[in-house]
Structure formats: C-alpha cells, structure tokens
C-alpha cells in the first residue's frame, strides 16, 4: 500500500514537495493545507490536489473566493501516514501538538529549532538516524548543501576543520518584503553564523566555522568553502569524488557558467520545473588543494535542494527503503542529475 502523505503549507517548499510526492511509485498525496485562498491555492485545485483549510476560521474566505475545500487540516493529518510541515519558520513548532494529537509522524523544515525534533536529517549523511522518529527536521538549504559536500570528504579523507563563508540571497523571488535592496550585510556580524551549529546536528563531532553575508539577490546562495583534510589528495581526485556523488553537479569550465544567473538559465534550458536545481553546483575549476587544504565555490538553490531530502525522509521515518534505495528512486523520479 502506498504511503499516504499530507503536506501542511503549500508555499515555496510545500508545493514542490507535493509535486515530488505525486511522482513517487510508493507514495500518494492525501492533500495539502493552505492558510489563505491565494494563487497557490488555485494551483493546488488545478493540480487536483485535495485542498484543506489550515485555519478553520478562514474557511469562509476560501468559499468567497470560489475555492472548494476537502476539509480542515485536522482531517488531513488524521488521514495521513506522515505529514510534511512546510509552513513558515516557527509555525511548525505551533503545529507539533496537532500532529501528536493524531499520532502522525511529522517532518519539519530547517527554519525550525533542532530542539523541536528527535533528529535532524540529511539523506546522504544520516538516513538511518530518522528510523521510527516521530518528529524529524530536514535541515535548511544551506546545511543540506554543506552536508552533501562534507559527507564524502569525511568518509574518504577525514575532515580536520571546515571553514565556510556563505553569501546568502536576500530573499526568494516571491518574498517582496525581504532585503537588503542596496546593501551588503554581515549576517550575523559575530562568529559563527547559525549554519555551523546546524551542520553539527548532522555531524556532531565536526569542527566547523561559518560566516554569513546577505546580498541583494534572489537567485541562489553561494558558498566559499575551505576544508582542512586529514590527508593530502590532489585536486583531481577530490573533484572526481565529488563528481561521483548523486546530488552534486561539477560545472564544467567549458560551459561558461560564471554565476547563479547562468545556472538558472541552464536549468530552464534543461526543462527543469520552476527552473529548480536540486543539486549542489560546484565550479569544477574552483576545486583546489594547497597542502591538505581544499578550496572550492558552490551554489545552492534555496527553493529546491531540500525537496529530494523531504522525500527520502518520508521513507527513512517509515522504514520503507534503505538510504541507497530511497535516493535512487527519488533521483530517478525527479530527474536529479545534470
């Protein structure tokens, strides 16, 4: 029998996860929940996704907009084997009691506190840790990207210390209230940014320092990475290792892709839905070794890189596949791999 999946929150992440669920051979989308009858609610109806009211007091708003509802979020959660909470940061914590009341395991997004959950999750790094957990946090877009990078390096060479400067987009394309508009902000000014401690929820013993900047861009995040390894491979060997990973894309120098804008254009030309890039995008010519120090640049698409992770987390919690089986199925159905 297919896994019955509910998605609570049908915005940037939720709509992508819902679409991904419908592509899985072992899953069925029970429905999605929205707080308001906006264009995304209309999209859910057009996609024939059963739509539920996330806030009961707003049912009249949906009716006034001519949008038919399948019920309330309580009914959605009750009908599901597992729920993906894709609500804005902080709302997942408010929803936890709802999921517990229905004894439905829940996945939360990286904006929630690690203290909220039993385990933080990355499919490449700690898939098995989520087995039978009631509350699992799929780490943020940046932490997902760093975990995918650090896992093979740790396994193959050992990591003595990681240092990362994250140049973060100011907001997503649809977040008109975010910024900066004309500024470059240390965010935060003090060390570390939250990303290092977040990586430690996946790799508890890893020595990592992170710094963050926010810039007036919406396309992607960019990471400047320095990792001191416990051995001294050459750059070609490291590049080959990273190229072998299923959710990394080493950008060939010959492609002429010199920034996030061309990466998004590349994704559109390849027919990616919403121009999504699920993979870490690593500039191949940036992969350099100085002694035991590795340097590279990578770009992370903040709207989509966690989508395959959510799909894998569903299987991890319910124990329906091992890590390799799940990632292979997810990658094949979504079309991961450039």
UniProtKB/Swiss-Prot annotation:
A molecular-function term among this protein's GO annotations: NADP binding
A GO biological process of this protein is: glycolytic process
Can you state which reaction this protein catalyses?
A: D-glyceraldehyde 3-phosphate + phosphate + NADP(+) = (2R)-3-phospho-glyceroyl phosphate + NADPH + H(+); D-glyceraldehyde 3-phosphate + phosphate + NAD(+) = (2R)-3-phospho-glyceroyl phosphate + NADH + H(+)
Task: Give the SUPFAM superfamilies listed for this entry.
Answer: Glyceraldehyde-3-phosphate dehydrogenase-like, C-terminal domain, NAD(P)-binding Rossmann-fold domains
The keyword Endoplasmic reticulum belongs to this UniProt entry's keyword annotation: no
Matching entries from Pfam families are given as:
Gp_dh_C
EC top class, as a word: oxidoreductase
**Pathway listed for it?**
Carbohydrate degradation; glycolysis; pyruvate from D-glyceraldehyde 3-phosphate: step 1/5
Please, which domain of life does this record's source organism belong to?
Archaea
Tell me the InterPro entries matching this sequence.
Answer: GlycerAld/Erythrose_P_DH, GlycerAld_3-P_DH_AS, GlycerAld_3-P_DH_cat, GlycerAld_3-P_DH_NAD(P)-bd, Glyceraldehyde-3-P_DH_2_arc, NAD(P)-bd_dom_sf
Q: Which UniProt keyword terms apply here?
A: Cytoplasm, Glycolysis, NAD, NADP, Oxidoreductase
> Which residues does D-glyceraldehyde 3-phosphate bind?
140-142, 195-196
Q: What is its EC number?
A: 1.2.1.59
GO annotation, cellular component aspect: cytoplasm
Q: Does the keyword Nucleotidyltransferase apply?
A: no
Active-site residues per Swiss-Prot or TrEMBL entry: 141 (nucleophile)
Q: Where is the signal peptide?
A: none
Family, similarity comment: Belongs to the glyceraldehyde-3-phosphate dehydrogenase family.
**What is said about its interaction partners and assembly?**
Homotetramer.
Name the chain's protein. Answer: Glyceraldehyde-3-phosphate dehydrogenase
Which species is the source of this protein?
Answer: Natronomonas pharaonis (strain ATCC 35678 / DSM 2160 / CIP 103997 / JCM 8858 / NBRC 14720 / NCIMB 2260 / Gabara) (Halobacterium pharaonis)
């Amino acid at each position: 029998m297919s896994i019955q999946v509910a998605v609570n929150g049908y915005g940037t992440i939720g709509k992508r996860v819902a679409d991904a669920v419908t592509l899985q051979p072992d899953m069925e989308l029970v429905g999605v929940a929205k707080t308001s009858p906006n264009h995304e609610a209309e999209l859910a109806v057009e996609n024939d996704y059963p739509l539920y009211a996330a806030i009961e007091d707003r049912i009249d708003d949906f009716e006034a907009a001519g949008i038919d509802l399948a019920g309330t979020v309580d009914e959605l959660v009750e009908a599901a084997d597992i729920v993906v909470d894709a609500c804005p940061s902080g709302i997942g914590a408010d929803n936890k009691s709802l999921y517990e009341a229905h004894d439905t395991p829940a996945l939360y997004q990286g904006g929630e506190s690690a203290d909220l959950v039993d385990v933080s999750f990355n499919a490449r790094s700690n898939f098995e840790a989520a087995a039978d957990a009631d509350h699992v946090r799929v780490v943020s877009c940046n932490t997902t990207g760093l975990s995918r990078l650090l896992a093979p390096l740790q396994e193959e060479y050992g990591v003595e210390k990681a240092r990362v400067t994250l140049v973060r987009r100011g907001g997503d394309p649809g977040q008109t209230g975010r910024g900066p508009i004309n500024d470059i902000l240390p965010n935060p000014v003090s060390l570390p940014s939250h990303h290092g401690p977040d990586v430690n929820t996946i790799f508890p013993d890893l020595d990592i320092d992170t710094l963050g900047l926010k810039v007036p861009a919406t396309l992607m995040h960019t990471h400047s990475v320095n990792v001191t390894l416990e051995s001294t491979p050459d750059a070609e060997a490291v590049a080959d290792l990273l190229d072998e990973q299923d959710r990394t894309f080493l950008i060939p120098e010959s492609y002429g892709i010199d920034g996030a804008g061309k990466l998004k254009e590349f994704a559109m030309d390849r027919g990616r839905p919403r121009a999504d890039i699920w993979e870490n995008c690593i500039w191949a010519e940036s992969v350099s070794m100085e002694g035991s120090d590795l340097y590279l640049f990578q770009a992370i698409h903040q709207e989509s890189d966690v989508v395959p992770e959510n799909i894998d987390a569903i299987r991890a919690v319910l124990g329906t596949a091992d890590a390799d089986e799940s990632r292979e199925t997810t990658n094949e159905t979504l079309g991961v791999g450039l």
